[in-house]
């Protein structure tokens, strides 16, 4: 038993022990009293009590000890029975105990230094450290931000957190406004800035998903991501076709990964292979160029992963195989655009290095056209997997630089496979995901039954305002009810007039749905796990220490994308280089 438990137990039973010791003297007084009748004994005790208490120490006579034990145990039993049968009152909380949080409630969760926090509201922040002084105050850094159009999701929450500059950042940027306004802030704080632009490919760095394929497991992940985000709208048809496409794409990508030169491992080569896969319905023996490649592979590597997958695909008859090829071609149609082929020819984003040094990756997408948004989803899927693997394999489970994913317009980028599992596991690797939505129903529409799991792993949830009914209903229920006093009057007039007053207690929502719908534009509601909700002011961007470096403050600070992409790398005298002789490399 620990000292703390022993002290608590002693404090609980000390009064009964003291009573038992004192009453041993009463037992002695009773024993010394003369008389056979009860009345005589009691009268005689008037003289023996002073004698018994003349000695301050308790009596050790067996009968006296028995009296003490009975008195102490009797009092303990009486207290127990009274407590068991006592009425349970919660004065002032009869219909609910909901209330708004205070500065004292949030204080244990905030770091003393402003820059070491996530900005939640004007008055509430959350420390970046995963190991606070008191472990019970540890919270994950995942944040769910919900707010209707014009509620200030970007200005009042996303941009202030980006300006904190304490982590690496991956920012979903509709219309590229965040990059233009905050890009120079990142550069002046020593960040490497990387850009993937799906609106204007000419103002983008190159991104090649094949560059991050290092194993057969990675091949399956890439195929899953590609198919999940290029399946189009509406209900799916026969799953046979999707499974067949998966077989073919897996086989082709595996072949490129294991057999093709690095410069040919891209979507352009994948499309070229598909375009040469002619099928003759009336000639089952016909072999197209890709068939010949896999036939040669089977001779060289009989048990290759690519060969096994392709063999399964070839079980399809000619007409069926043709339909599979058409489906694959339609799925990869966006890559027929030359600009997109050029964009995915090689890789400059270096997604696996975001946890090594401070980096800001801006993923620019259109908020009106979702044609190329699947690329953004592919980036996030590969990013999470790469960083988790690197944290486990290289850094012992935790990245040296925290990586924050600020996913604005989360509903528009498509589905990130296994997001419900990722948000539950990335915390320990120093990765966090912040989802920004216009309504909770958007998450439900994309992730179905997994939406609740995703929300459940967001320790911080912020409502900036809106009128979507489901969001208002859920939020009102989560805020709970408070107990209020009701004052009623009655006034009866007539031949026998009367007047009366009455008081009663009622339960009332902390904020009802109609009150949430008309929430002040400068207010927001913060819910932090394990803490009372906060009704606070939104953070004022102009008060941030780095605000003067943004283009909001001075248009001269506008980030020039073209100038940045066309810059030449400067070689510093202290840079180290590794020289490799190509002729000395072993042949494939």
Regions found by a protein language model. Name each.
Residues 98-100, 125, 141-142, 308, ...:
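General secondary-structure edge motif
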Residues 423-525:
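Conserved ATP-driven motor cores of ASCE-family P-loop NTPases powering translocation/secretion/packaging/pilus
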Residues 126-132, 231-240, 262, 485-504:
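Low-complexity, polar-biased intrinsically disordered regions enriched in Pro/Ser/Thr/Gly
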Residues 1-151, 155-158, 202, 481, ...:
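Basic- and hydrophobic-enriched, low-structure N-terminal and domain-boundary segments
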Residues 21-28, 134-431, 446, 514-538, ...:
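P-loop NTPase motor domains
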Residues 113-120, 374-382, 475:
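Conserved long hydrophobic alpha-helices within structured protein cores
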Residues 13-16, 30, 100, 157, ...:
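A residue-identity detector for tryptophan
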Residues 49-55, 63-118, 216-226, 272-276, ...:
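Short alpha-helical interface patches
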């Amino acid at each position: 038993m620990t000292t703390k438990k022993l002290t608590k137990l002693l404090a609980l039973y000390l009064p009964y022990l003291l009573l038992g010791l004192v009453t041993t003297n009463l037992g002695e007084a009773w024993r010394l009293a003369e008389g056979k009748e009860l009345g005589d004994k009691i009268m005689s005790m008037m003289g023996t009590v002073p004698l018994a208490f003349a000695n301050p120490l308790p009596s050790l006579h067996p009968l006296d000890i028995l009296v003490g034990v009975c008195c102490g145990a009797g009092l303990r039993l009486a207290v127990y029975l009274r407590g068991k049968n006592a009425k349970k009152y919660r004065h002032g909380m009869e219909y609910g105990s909901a209330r708004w949080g205070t500065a004292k409630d949030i204080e244990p969760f905030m770091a003393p230094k402003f820059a070491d926090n996530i900005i939640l509201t004007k008055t509430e922040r959350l420390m970046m450290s995963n190991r606070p002084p008191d472990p019970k105050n540890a919270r994950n850094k995942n944040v769910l931000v919900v707010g209707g159009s014009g509620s200030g999701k970007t200005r009042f929450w996303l941009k202030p957190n980006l300006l904190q500059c304490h982590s690496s950042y991956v920012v979903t940027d509709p219309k590229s406004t965040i990059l233009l306004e905050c890009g120079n802030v990142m550069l002046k704080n020593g960040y490497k800035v990387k850009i993937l632009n799906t609106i204007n490919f000419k103002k983008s760095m190159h991104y090649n998903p094949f560059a991050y394929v290092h194993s057969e497991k990675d091949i399956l992940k890439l195929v899953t991501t590609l198919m999940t985000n290029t399946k189009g709208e509406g209900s799916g048809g026969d799953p046979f076709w999707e499974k067949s496409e998966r077989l073919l794409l897996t086989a082709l990508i595996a072949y490129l990964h294991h057999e093709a030169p690095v410069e040919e491992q891209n979507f352009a080569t994948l499309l070229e292979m598909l375009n040469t896969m002619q099928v003759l319905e009336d000639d089952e023996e016909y072999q197209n160029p890709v068939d010949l490649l896999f036939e040669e592979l089977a001779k060289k590597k009989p048990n290759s992963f690519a060969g096994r997958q392709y063999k399964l695909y070839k079980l399809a008859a000619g007409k069926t195989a043709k339909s599979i090829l058409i489906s694959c071609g339609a799925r990869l149609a966006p890559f027929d655009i030359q600009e997109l082929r050029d964009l995915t020819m090689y890789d400059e984003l270096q997604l696996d290095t975001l946890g090594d040094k401070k980096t800001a990756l801006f993923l620019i997408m259109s908020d009106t056209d979702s044609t190329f948004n699947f690329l953004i989803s592919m980036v996030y899927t590969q990013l999470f997997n790469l960083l988790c693997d690197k944290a486990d394999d290289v850094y012992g489970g935790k990245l040296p630089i925290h990586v924050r994913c600020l996913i604005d317009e989360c509903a528009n980028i498509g589905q990130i496979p296994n997001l419900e599992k990722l948000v539950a596991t990335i915390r320990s690797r120093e990765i966090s995901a912040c989802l920004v939505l216009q309504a909770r129903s958007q998450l439900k529409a994309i992730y179905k039954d997994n939406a609740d799991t995703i929300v459940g792993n967001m320790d911080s949830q912020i409502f900036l305002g809106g009128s979507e009914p489901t969001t208002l209903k859920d939020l009102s229920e989560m805020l709970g009810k408070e107990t209020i006093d009701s004052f009623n009057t009655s006034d009866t007039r007539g031949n026998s007039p009367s007047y009366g007053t009455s008081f009663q207690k009622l339960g009332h929502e902390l904020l009802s749905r109609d009150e949430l719908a008309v929430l002040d534009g400068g207010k927001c509601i913060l819910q932090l796990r394990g803490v009372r909700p906060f009704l606070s002011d939104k953070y004022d961007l102009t008060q941030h220490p780095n605000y003067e470096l943004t283009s909001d403050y001075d248009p001269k600070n506008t980030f020039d994308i073209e100038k940045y992409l066309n810059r030449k790398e400067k070689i510093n005298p202290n840079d180290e280089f590794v020289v490799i002789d190509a002729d000395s490399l072993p042949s494939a």
